[in-house]
Each structure stands twice: as C-alpha cells, then as structure tokens.
From Swiss-Prot:
It is found in: Golgi apparatus membrane. With EMP70 and TMN2, plays a critical role in the late stages of a nutrient-controlled pathway notably regulating FLO11 gene expression. Acts downstream of RAS2 and TOR. Essential for cell adhesion and filamentous growth. May play a role as effector of cellular copper homeostasis. InterPro entries: EMP70 (IPR004240). The keyword Protein biosynthesis does not apply. Residues 1-33 form the signal peptide. The keyword Transmembrane applies. This is Transmembrane 9 superfamily member 3. It comes from Saccharomyces cerevisiae (strain ATCC 204508 / S288c) (Baker's yeast). GO terms for biological process: intracellular copper ion homeostasis; invasive growth in response to glucose limitation; monoatomic ion transport; protein localization to membrane; pseudohyphal growth; vacuolar transport. GO terms for cellular component: Golgi apparatus; Golgi membrane; membrane. Residues 34-290, 393-405, 478-494, 575-592, 659-665 are lumenal.
Length: 706
C-alpha cells in the first residue's frame, strides 16, 4: 500500500510534463515573427485585449513570406511546396520553421522564402528564378494542375495568402485561402502554370508608424516570359508542355510584383472576417440559419423530454401503488394458471418486477459483459475528449486561430481521458460483479473482500485500449500517405512522441484511475438491496415461460430506429464541419459555439431515448429471454445506432459530394471517417447504457426499499 502515493506523484508529474509540452507546441508558432517585439501602448492594449497581440510595422521593415504546401479538395494528399520539382528552391540562408504539433498533423511544411517584401514599398516587377526541371517534373506539374491543387502561403505569422472573389448574394468581398497552381483551358484541355503572382498586401494604420497587416491577396497570372503583366491582359500565357525526350530540360520563369494598400474599414481584430462564411450566405443570414437549426433541435429535444417526463412520473409515482405484480406461475405440466390467462396482463404488468428480474435473474455472457464495459469506457473517454476540448476552446473567444486550440485541447483531453475511462470501467466492473456474485456468498465479509479485488490489466485495458487502437490505425494509414511522399504523413519524431505519451502518460493514468475507483466504496444501497437468496421462491419474482431464445427483428428495428433522432440534431453542424474539413480545405469552421450546443443537445436526446427505449423493452419484451439476458447490450445499442447513421451520411458525403480521385485518397477518407464515427457511436452508446442502467437500477432499488 505504500507504493500508491509514489504512483500518484509519478502520474501527476507526467501530466504536468505533457501539458507543458503541448503548451510549448501550441505557442511556438506564435513567437515567430519578423524578429521585433511590438511595443504596445496602453490605448492599444485596450484595443487588442486578447491572448494574441499584433505585430506592428513601420515603413521599410522587412516582412517574411512563408511558403507552406499545396493541397487539393479532390485528394487527401498535400505536398510540401519546396519538395515539388518545378518550384524555385530556397537559397542557402533560408531555413525551415519550427512546426507545432497542430501544424504537423495538418501536414504543414513551412519555409522561409526568397520573396523580398518591405513594408509600404511597392515593387512592380521582380524575377524570382528560372526553374530548371525535367520531363518527370513537368508531368508532375501537369498532374497537380489537373487535380486542382492550390498553393498555401503565409505572412505575418499566420495570415494566409488568399484568392479574392465577390459574393453573388451580398456583393461583398470574401477570401478563400490559397491560390490555384494553374488552370485548365476548358476548350482545348491544355494546362497552364501560374508562374507570376501579384501580391497585394493590405494594412491598417492604427497609430503613427504603427501599422498592422489585415489582408494578403494573391492574383496569379500565367506568363510565357519574365515580364510582369500588371493589370494588362495582352500577354501570352505559359502552357505546360511535357517534352518527349527524357533528358530534355525545361526552364520555368517565375516573377512577382508587390503592392501595398491601406485598409480603412477592417482592423486587425477583424482581419479573419473575410475568410468566414465564404459568401454563400450573408453574415446575418448564416447566424440566423444556425439559430433556426438550433431551435429545431431544441424543439425535438423538448418533445422527447415531455415523453420522458411522463414515463418517469408514471414509473416512479403512479405505478408505485401497483408495485406488486400478478404472479405468472407455471406448473410441472406447463399448463398456465388462471392469472396467466388474463388478456390484459401486458398492459398491467409492473416494470418493478421486470427490473428485478433483469438485474437478479439475467444470465449475461461474462466475456460479453467485460467487452461491454470496455466499450462503455471507450465511449466515456471520447465524450470527455469532445466536450472538454470544445468547452475550453469556446472559452478562448479572443484567440484568433481557434483551429489550433481545438486540436491541441482534443489531444490533451484524449490523453487525460484515460483516467476517466479506467475509473468508469472499474466502477462498472465492481457493480456488475456485486450483482453477479452476491448470492454465492454466505459470509458478507468474504463477499466484500472479493468484489473489491483489483484487476490492473482490465483497468489498463479500459483506459489505454482506445488510444492504442487509434494510434495503431493512424500509423497504418500513415504508411499509405508516406508511400505517396505527402506532407500529411507523420514524421518519425512525431510518432515517437505519441508513443512516448502513450506509455508514459496513458498507461499510468489508466492504472491510477482504476486504483481511485477501487478505493471508493460502493453506496450502501447497492449492497443492501441485493439479497443473499436471489431465487424467485418467494412468489414475487417473474417466472418466464420456458421458450427457446430466438432473434426478434422488431426489437432490433426499434433499437436502430432510435439513431435517426440524434442525426437530426447534429446534421446541420456535420454539414458545415465536413465542408470545412473535406470539401473546401481552404475555408474555416468557426461555429464552435453552435457545435458545442448541438453536442449537448445530442447527449441529452440520447439519454432521453435510452430511458424511453428501456421502458418500452420492460413493458413489451419482458418474456423475451434474449432481452432479459442482454438488456445491457440493448441499451448500449440504442445510443450506438446514432453513430451508425453518422457513418452512413459520411459515406454518402465521400462518394456523392466530395468527388475524391484516387484509391488511396478514398481509402484514407473512409478509414478516418470510420474511426471517428465509431468513436461517436461508442460515446453515444456509453451515454445510453449509463442512463438506462441508472433508470433500471433506480426502479429496482425503489422497489426494494418499499
């Protein structure tokens, strides 16, 4: 017993180390800039009161343009910009930037570039390089242009290069992150390279010689030579021609021009507004649309809540006077008694007796029960991750780049969720062990000693299996991406980092959670409510007619129909998230508040459906031996079915909406959506099981205490 404090200290130290590492990873990209610490006055502190302060520039200050990667909506394979065989390579003094964990997972590869930018100084024409490339390089260029790849650049630490367009709904200017690598002539099917870029950098003057950058617009052009067209349209475009000779070299001219323009209407605090919404709806209409969707979800939840309240009141108060159920006896010859022939027995049947029968007389498969507890612990860990990360991220309302905060918090809570998963798994194991073995002991002391036996292996499985499965699956998919030389492949150092976190933090946290759960005694009513003799000889139990267990399709249809309602609640936010992550990688999802509220409503709805479903099972399936022995699985499947519909919608989105090309990209999309939706199913299933188990046990213990 003396080693437990040491385990606790080691575990807490590991948690602190992980939090410090993730904190440094998160803020590392914030400290990169042009090398100057901004001097902020007291008035500017009030103006930029937030976690991130702007960089201030004076005329002539150097500004670094960061090149990153190229990516396409048609594939899941981004590539580093400087790894491409047709781009201008960096000079010797240009270095790669340190990447945070979020950027590595997103596939970023940031480098300093040779583009010369000085604040406030226009440059009408500048030659970057004449890139020498081979036939293979030209083939790669033609392939990427045909697959719709866009180039991702950055300035001022995190501000993306943007393509500008005017919305057809409100006629306002909007940005789409990145600019196309080239284009295809629809008439001739020829491809052209964007080898000239006109950079328009917009700045806002907040004070004398204190300027902030609020926009980075890129206007790409395809030019056949080294001259800069400017606003002229009278120039010859550069056609991508693949040479026939393997040894023939092609020289690609790259030029650029820079213009600085002052922006009076947009300040630094609102520079991301142009990237949001993408102009499909006006800002007011978009917010109204989400509020209407949220109102519909609230209406669904309130309707189900009303039904749940009626059931709860009827079970807990109205039926209390009728708690003594009729006796359904069977004689030796199998002839039913007069009580059994009551035509109205199903309508008058008491759920109290069914609850007692399920808990005391159910004969679940012990291995299946252990598997169920494992799945419930997985779901608890995922719920802890989603709700915890969104709660913290939504509180960061003054953090400009919320994407980094969500991903960082998700990783942190997923690691810390090992404690919650092992805690819940150990407690459930203690409860089910209590109900299963109490009748076998005549000595209460021996019984209490047995049910408190601690199983470290099972505890570690509860807390560490889900992170291990996700990690192994990710590494397997990573090998596919690595074979294509894509930047979305995790580097070896990152893989070692995740494995270290798993063995140093997840496993000790799992063990610690099980120890804590095992040292907390069960409530007294759990022990006092279970008699030493669990037979039905007192005449108050349920004697089910001897029948062969068989598959009941109506039960399964009803269970899996329960998943439609959760999909209706989360459907709109799923559309926006999928569009941001898959359909248009260049857009930003920013409705985290609506997403958080939708998830809360989803959880409430799942809990209510589990109560309604378990009540209906007790009312109409009390003679079903399969339901009696596996009621825990049925309650779990009620919530699990919601994730099944989410996965079906994900498959529809991948094949019908995304139009992804390539077997590898399709396989990666399907696998990642399957991993995520399985975890969603486990989370909803765990919530459904815990709620239904609480409801059934509350009925049972209330009956015992009558």
């Amino acid at each position: 017993m003396r080693v437990r404090p040491k385990r606790s200290v080691i575990t807490l130290m590991a948690i602190v180390v992980v939090m410090l590492i993730l904190r440094n990873q998160f803020y590392s990209s914030r400290t990169r800039g042009h090398g100057q610490e901004p001097v902020i006055s007291s008035s500017q502190k009030n103006l930029y009161d937030g976690w991130i302060t702007p960089n201030f520039y004076r005329k002539g200050d150097p500004l670094e343009l960061i090149v990153n990667k190229v990516e396409s909506d048609l594939t899941q394979l981004p590539y580093a910009y400087y790894d491409l065989p047709f781009t201008c390579p960096p000079t010797m003094h240009k270095k790669p930037l340190h990447l945070s964990l979020n950027e590595i997972i997103r596939g970023d590869r940031k480098w300093e570039s040779d583009y010369k930018l000085k604040f406030g100084e226009d440059n009408p024409c500048e030659t970057l390089c004449a890139r020498k490339t081979t036939k293979e390089g030209m083939q790669t260029l033609d392939k990427l242009v045909r697959e719709g790849y866009v180039v991702q650049w950055l300035i001022d630490d995190e501000l993306p290069a943007a393509t500008t367009f005017i919305s057809t709904t409100d006629h306002k200017k909007y940005y789409a992150s990145g600019f196309p690598l080239g284009f295809i002539d629809p008439d001739t099917d020829k491809t052209y390279l964007h080898n000239h870029v006109m950079l328009v950098i917009r700045f806002h003057a907040s004070d004398n010689d204190k300027n902030t950058i609020v926009g980075f617009e890129v206007y790409p052009r395809s030019v056949s030579d080294y001259h800069c067209p400017g606003a002229s349209k009278n120039y010859e475009q550069y056609e991508i021609v693949i040479p026939e000779d393997e040894n023939e070299l092609t020289y690609l001219p790259f030029t650029y021009s820079v213009y600085w323009r002052e922006e009076f209407e947009v300040d630094w605090n609102h520079r991301w507004d142009y990237f949001l919404n993408a102009g499909e709806l006006s800002d007011e209409q978009s917010i109204q649309f989400h509020w209407m969707s949220l109102a519909n979800s609230v209406g669904i939840v309130l309707s189900i809540s009303f039904i749940t309240l009626i059931i709860y009141v009827r079970v807990m108060y109205t039926d209390k006077s009728n708690s003594k159920s009729p006796k359904y006896m069977i004689n030796i010859e199998g002839i039913e008694t007069e009580d059994d022939l009551d035509d109205d027995k199903y309508g008058k049947y008491s759920v109290y007796t069914v609850a007692k029968d399920w808990i005391q007389n159910g004969r679940p498969n012990l291995f299946g029960l252990k598997v169920l507890i494992l799945l419930v612990s997985f779901g608890v860990q995922f719920l802890f991750t989603i709700i915890g990360s969104l709660t913290i991220s939504c509180s960061m309302n003054k953090l400009h780049n919320v994407r980094n905060s969500v991903l960082t918090m998700a990783i942190l809570f997923f690691v810390l969720g090992a404690f919650m998963a092992s805690f819940v798994g150990t407690r459930l194991s203690m409860v089910t062990k209590t109900k299963r073995t109490k009748a076998n002991y005549l000595d209460d002391n021996r019984y209490l000693k047995d049910y408190k036996k601690f199983s470290p292996i099972f505890t570690i499985l509860c807390g560490s299996s889900l992170p291990g499965i996700v990690m192994v699956s990710t590494f397997l998919l990573n090998s596919i991406v690595w074979a294509h030389d894509s930047t979305s492949a995790l580097p070896f150092k990152t893989i070692v980092f995740f494995m270290s976190i798993y063995f140093i933090v997840c496993i000790p946290l799992s063990l610690f959670g099980g120890i804590v759960a095992n040292n907390i005694p069960l409530p007294q009513y759990w022990l006092s409510g279970i008699t030493k003799d669990e037979s039905n000889s007192d005449g108050n139990g349920l004697f089910v007619p001897k029948s062969r267990a068989k598959f009941n399709p109506l039960v399964y249809c009803g269970i899996y129909l329960c998943g439609i309602f959760p999909l209706l609640v989360i459907y709109v936010e799923m559309q926006y998230v999928y569009k941001s992550l898959w359909l248009e990688k260049t857009t930003f999802y920013y409705f985290y508040g609506f997403l958080f509220l939708s998830i809360i409503l989803l959880c409430v709805l799942t809990m209510e459906i589990s109560i309604i479903g378990s009540y209906l099972l007790m009312r109409f399936c009390f003679e079903d031996k399969v339901v009696r022995n596996n009621w825990r699985w049925k309650c779990f499947e009620m919530g699990f079915s919601g994730g099944v519909y989410m996965e079906l919608y994900s498959l529809y989105y991948i094949f019908a909406v995304l139009n992804i090309h390539g077997f590898s990209s399709i396989l990666i999309s399907i696998c990642y959506s399957l991993i995520f939706n399985v975890m969603c199913s486990l989370g909803l299933g765990a919530l459904s099981y815990l709620t239904a188990s609480w409801f059934i046990n509350k009925i049972y213990h209330q009956k015992v205490n009558l």
